[in-house]
From Swiss-Prot:
DCTP binds at residues 107-112, 125, 133-135, 154, 168. PANTHER family: DCTP DEAMINASE. This is dCTP deaminase, dUMP-forming. It catalyses: dCTP + 2 H2O = dUMP + NH4(+) + diphosphate. Belongs to the dCTP deaminase family. It is an enzyme of class 3 (hydrolase). Pfam families: DCD (PF22769). Residues 173-193 have a biased composition (Basic and acidic residues). It comes from Methanopyrus kandleri (strain AV19 / DSM 6324 / JCM 9639 / NBRC 100938). Its EC number is 3.5.4.30. The active site is at residue 135.
Length: 193
């Protein structure tokens, strides 16, 4: 696998191999790094309710343990110490080329505030279409304010050694087409008898 440079990313955007919406020209100049593209925080969050249960069971729909919060673009969202919050990118991403994949990395400026931008879901398969769910965790001993539109992650695009035989879109991925932050759908992996 090779990493796409800024030139390669621009070309892939022009040719429709990668789609990022919205992507204003002036923002592209600010967000495009030598080998990555910064993505912004959306305005929708999912928080976990404190329930009087002994644990979370991955075989059960996690959505019942969550609450969805939508804020205005000019509001702020406070993430407390030790809190896990699901959020969504402002941008809609499509990876249309079967030989391109993406990997999310938290921005170091956010990490230096104690915020981890994604816990595990940092891989974006060929054929992905949707907004990316972020798993934000605050490791700072202080609450941290987050604002919609702030750059929170960068996506690094890689070219595969050969095109994927079956893309994420063709494999009926559980999160394909997401527009909102999605709680775990792991319960769908378990067979019920």
């Amino acid at each position: 696998m090779t990493v796409l440079s800024d030139r390669d990313i621009k070309r892939a955007l022009e040719e429709g191999d990668i789609v990022v919406k919205p992507l204003e020209e002036e923002y592209l100049e600010e967000a495009l790094g030598p080998a990555s593209l910064d993505l912004r925080l959306g305005n929708e969050f999912v928080v976990f309710k404190t329930l009087h249960k002994p644990c979370i069971d991955p075989t059960v729909d996690a959505g019942e343990n969550t609450e969805r919060i939508v804020i205005d673009e000019d509001e702020e969202f406070v993430i407390n110490p030790g809190e896990l919050v699901l959020a969504v990118t402002h941008e809609w991403i499509e990876i249309n080329a079967p030989d391109i994949t993406g990997v999310l990395h938290g921005r170091s400026s956010l990490g230096r505030l104690g915020i981890q931008a994604h816990v595990e879901a940092g891989y974006v398969d060929p054929g992905w279409r949707g907004r990316l769910t972020l798993e934000l965790v605050n490791f700072n001993p202080m609450p941290v304010k987050l604002r919609p539109g702030m750059r929170v992650v960068q996506i690094v695009f890689h070219r595969l050694s050969s095109p994927a035989e079956r893309t994420y879109a063709e494999s009926s991925g559980k999160y394909h087409g997401d527009e909102r932050p999605s709680p775990s759908k792991m319960h769908l992996d378990f067979c019920r008898g």
